[in-house]
């Protein structure tokens, strides 16, 4: 899944527009950030880019148009959406966003971790399948063959529909099943998420007990620097750095786990 975001500086419309591909490819990351900075936008923390237009497979994101956005939040959201493996998850995310009227970036990011809890009916012609999908949703997407064989999907669907709690949206009829929006994203520290398998995974903290920021290496230079800024780290010498995982042999992992006092973060030189 690829999207394109057309961004501008709301304080300087004369600077024109810049189109960013989402998720941002590693080999384009530094160049894109430099281009945004040249237009006096693209701060690591501030929502200083105006979303003029977004093009892609998620019409619900049109509600971000005309609003200020943060480029790293936008990139993370695009990566999360790219992880959705089927049309059902797309409908769950977009339907829940309409049902709960979410349009804030933090809410949309958190919704990617929660939308799997809602049931969305997009086709009422096969109630047996509707009931089976609803049962799977209620059980975290898992069910044994025996459970499914013994399930009366038609009756399960009728019971759901008869409750009358469905919200009609352009993406289907949404039944929230008591969904509680996850709060894993606090507006600053992105939750752990492996978009691409990294060679090395680290966490950094401003101090012991502070929220963790995840680093997936190798990564573009500016992405690492911006991640440290989001973590609140002014001087890298003062940060708490922890080894989490790697694709290196076990012997190398043992060495990496011993000490990070003099570690230089590797970067992607593409």
Residues covered by each model-derived region:
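Acidic, aromatic-enriched beta-alpha/helix-loop junctions
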Residues: 30-60, 64-66, 226-252
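Mature extracellular/secreted ectodomains of secretory-pathway proteins
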Residues: 84-137, 269
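Acidic, low-complexity intrinsically disordered segments
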Residues: 62-69, 73-86
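Conserved small/polar residues in nucleotide/adenosyl-binding loops
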Residues: 261-270
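Acidic, proline/glycine-rich low-complexity IDRs
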Residues: 132-211
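N-terminal ordered "arm"
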Residues: 1-44, 197-233
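Short, surface-exposed beta-strand/loop "edge" segments at domain boundaries and coil↔beta transitions
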Residues: 12-16, 57-60, 181-183, 207-214, ...
